[in-house]
Amino acid sequence: VASESHRHSHTVFHPHRGAWLRSKAPRWGWSEENMFECQVVARQMVTAVKPVMDRVKDAEVRDQLKRVSLSVLLNIAEANARRGKDRSNRFGIAEGSAREAEEAVWTAIAWGFVSKDEAREVLSLLDRVIAMLVRLRFPRKK
């Protein structure tokens, strides 16, 4: 039988140390490790969205995608310095921005600027960030 700490542990990549580390933080819910992991995935999303943005010919959609992608990352970073409801609100703003970014990517696909294959990585990362933000805002009850 797995111990309680083992059942709730997971690995998190720590870029400053350049290694995967085992985290004993709860898999879901707020913890420094989970918030850091969310920020790392958001950084990956911002990197992956750039080639998609560059293909979008409509300036309004491109600019909105740029703004909301950056908003996701910056609001997660700002949540790190907050406590209580203010932290939850920042996660909520980041989640809303991630959902906007997702719709902007789907619009770019619908309008023929990028294919689903070209946008697959960005959509996958956005989906992951949204799921993490929901769990950071609304941790599961034991």
Task: Provide a role label for each language-model segment.
Residues V1-K142:
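Amphipathic alpha-helical assembly/interaction segments
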